[in-house]
Amino acid sequence: AEAVLPYSDAGNQGLLAMMGLNPRFFGHMGASKLLRAICGPTVGAGLRMTNGTGRGMDALELEHSQLILLWGTNTKLTNRHLWPTIEAARRRGARLVVIDPIRTLTADAIDETRGDRFVQPLPGTDIAMMLAMMHVIIRDGLTDDAWVGAHTTGFEELRDAVAGWTPSRAAEVTGVAAEVIEQLALDYATVRPAGIRTLIGAEHHENGAMFFRTLGCLPALTGAWAERGGGIAKSVGSYSEDLIDVNALFRPELERAGGRREPRTLNMSLLGEILTSPHAGGTDGPGIHALIVWNCNPLATVPRAELIRRGMERDDLFTVVHEQFLTDTARYADIVLPATTQIESDDVVLPWGHLWVGWNGAAIDPVAESCSNTDLFRRLAHA
């Protein structure tokens, strides 16, 4: 049974669609389990190293900020329900700084005549800019010493670590002018409250955890956390256990048949290695001979796409994909099953930019032969 690998991710974000019935179905089968480590754990690990928690401020509190840094997030396009909150803050006089290696729709929304700014570091160099900002803040005595003394440890070590990261040095790495970095640091330390909004973009790249670990040091130095509208607002998945009892939906006690041992767990980020190794990427147990994919398109989203492609081309791999579209992954499937869209099924949805649970009510019946994820596994269990 461990030769079967269920492979899925967040899909349309519905909790039942993500983890409603599939763990029970594959758990009773004894199939390999999947460690969903490609999104979420990175940012949480990075912030916990600095803050001791993966949580941040409520994004809706950005309405009270006077300086908003949108760092690595195309908010106007991909987080549209938060944009009115940012616009409300701007009407109250807040300035907007967009930091992104790509000139996005959000970057185009800035207004330099009112003090907004677009800062465009080279890809993968954000950490150098953060270090230089901390260098300036400490050099110019702009730290909140009372906050640092009461709520942090390791200030001296951080001070020594950033001493060599001058704006000039960071400019050579990031491609951002030294004077821009200097002014950004001064603005961040002196305009209060200052809120940083970031999402999952950075964690999907090399050194993603270190991005968030370093970013977390900025509000700790300035004491931004002390004020409403100050701190870091990220995705709010870390609050999910406060919003809803997910175990009441997922029923983990129903996942294993009586007496069956716990199956092995495989890291979703290593799908290419798993599919091309006779022992599933060096783990104990058999190689993977059946791959069941839903809620994701790994050929487009998982590292080492060519290795995944090679694995999916194996003659001895049976692949089933439950999809709405003929994706890159679906093109390699032996069987493609039609999946419903978000508007065709009821579900419970947790938020990305606020602290309210959402109910997703179906607007139409499933089209033709398409079925929801929960219906798929219900039918398979009955078969």
Predicted features by range, described:
Residues 1-232, 255-383:
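Cofactor-pocket helix-loop regions in the catalytic cores of large enzyme subunits
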Residues 234, 242-243:
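Short glycine-cluster motifs
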Residues 240, 246-252:
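Surface-exposed loop and adjacent secondary-structure segments within mature catalytic domains
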